[in-house]
Structures are given as structure tokens and as C-alpha cells.
UniProtKB/Swiss-Prot annotation:
Parts of the chain that traverse the membrane: none
Lipidation (N-palmitoyl cysteine): C19
Protein name, as recorded: Flagellar L-ring protein
Gene Ontology BP term (one): bacterial-type flagellum-dependent cell motility
Source species: Ralstonia nicotianae (strain ATCC BAA-1114 / GMI1000)
Lipidation positions, renumbered (S-diacylglycerol cysteine): C19
SUBUNIT field: The basal body constitutes a major portion of the flagellar organelle and consists of four rings (L,P,S, and M) mounted on a central rod.
Gene behind the chain: flgH
Region forming the signal peptide: 1-18
Domain of life: Bacteria
């Protein structure tokens, strides 16, 4: 009975440790992913028989020569994500050391030199260490997402953030993006490259059986965490 209790306790501890070893990843895109434009202050309208005044901030009027690119809270910008990163590192080291020493006992008190030779002492040592290491990583991220201006900074830069979700089969995929856009980098198509966005944060996450298949099993994670090798 005691053995069964110990086995049950060990199994429970194993499951608890395995469940706690891999916490869900923390999001890197912080804050809201959208914003609505503020309501304009409506001044009393002076409408005549032909002329009908429309508030410029209501979205019903835009000047003929007004810039159509995003510049206010609530405006949208299309981000073209084209991220290509590659990094590699290689190190090597070598240490070699050797030494030897021999001590002999001279003839003493007429003793046989053959006997004295047995009392000679010699020692030698050698130490050698070689190490090599190399690692590399390559990442490609290509996507398109339309984000919303959530804040206009004092210098005119635009803080943008957005999210796009897609339900594919039995899983869900989501793309999140946030950063600071310089309005001068926005082209006439109201798009900007992700490489021109400051403080860019990009996420691509998924749920479902495809995402679960990419994760290591809990038992494998447990043995990997306790293995000394």
C-alpha cells in the first residue's frame, strides 16, 4: 500500500513538474491593437439653400488637395513585412601543456648502484584541451497587415498597432504588429515597409493540432530538464 502511495505521489509530482516547465510565450506586442478616432467638436452649421456645410473631421469631407496618407488617430496604414535575418558565430580554442621531471639517488655508503637506481623518481604529465563551437540562425518573415494609428507623438511620428486573425481548418493563426512610423516614409499608396518602422514588434502565432505537433511532449521535456548531459 505504501509503495502505491509513493508511486502515485511521484506520478503527480512528475505531471506537475512537466506542466510547469513550458509556460505559454509572452506576447511582445503590448497595448491596444486598434483605436477609434476622437469625435470632432461640432460647431453650429450655417447651411444655406445650396451650400451644406460638412465637418472636416467627420469623414464626410476631405479637401481636393488634402493628403490621403494616414496622419491622425484612427487612420490606417498598410505594413509590408519583409524581414530577413541571418546570423552565425564560430569559436575555437586549444590549450596544450606538458612537463617531466626525473630525480636519481647517488651512490651512498658503498651501496650497490643497481639498488640505488631503484630509488630513482621520475614523473611526467601532459594536458591538452581542444574546443570548437558554431551556431547559426536564418529567419524569413513575409506578410502584409493593415494597422491603425493609435497615437500621434509630439514630433509627428505615428504609433501604430494592429492584429489579423485567420481561422484555417482546425486552427487559428494570428499576426500582430506594432511600432513607430515616420510619416515621411509612407508612400502615396499609404504603405510602408517594416524595415522602416522603429521599435517594430511582430508576432506570428498559431493554435490547433498543427501548432501542437510542433511542441515537444511533456514527458520528453521532463527528461530533458533533469538530464545532466
Amino acid at each position: 500500500m505504501r509503495i502505491l502511495r509513493l508511486a502515485a505521489l511521484g506520478t503527480a509530482s512528475l505531471l506537475a513538474a512537466a506542466c510547469g516547465m513550458l509556460p505559454p510565450p509572452e506576447p511582445i506586442v503590448q497595448g491596444p491593437t486598434t483605436a477609434r478616432p476622437p469625435m470632432p467638436v461640432m460647431a453650429p452649421r450655417q447651411n444655406g439653400a445650396i451650400y451644406q456645410e460638412v465637418a472636416s473631421g467627420s469623414g464626410g469631407f476631405r479637401g481636393m488637395f488634402e493628403d490621403r496618407r494616414a496622419h491622425m488617430v484612427g487612420d490606417t496604414i498598410t505594413i509590408v513585412i519583409t524581414e530577413n535575418t541571418a546570423a552565425s558565430k564560430q569559436t575555437s580554442g586549444s590549450v596544450d601543456r606538458s612537463g617531466s621531471k626525473t630525480t636519481s639517488v647517488p651512490t651512498f655508503a658503498g651501496m650497490n648502484p643497481g639498488v640505488l637506481s631503484l630509488l630513482g623518481v621520475s614523473a611526467s604529465d601532459a594536458n591538452k584541451f581542444d574546443s570548437k563551437g558554431a551556431n547559426g540562425a536564418t529567419n524569413n518573415f513575409t506578410a502584409t497587415i493593415t494597422v491603425t494609428v493609435v497615437e500621434v507623438l509630439s514630433n509627428g511620428n505615428l504609433v501604430v498597432s494592429g492584429e489579423k486573425q485567420m481561422a484555417v481548418g482546425q486552427g487559428t493563426e494570428s499576426i500582430k504588429f506594432s511600432g513607430v512610423v515616420n510619416p515621411t516614409t509612407v508612400n502615396n499608396q499609404n504603405t510602408v515597409l517594416s524595415t522602416q518602422v522603429a521599435d517594430a514588434r511582430m508576432e506570428y502565432r498559431g493554435t490547433g493540432y498543427v501548432a501542437e505537433a510542433q511542441q515537444m511532449g511533456w514527458l520528453s521535456r521532463f527528461f530533458l530538464s533533469v538530464s545532466p548531459f
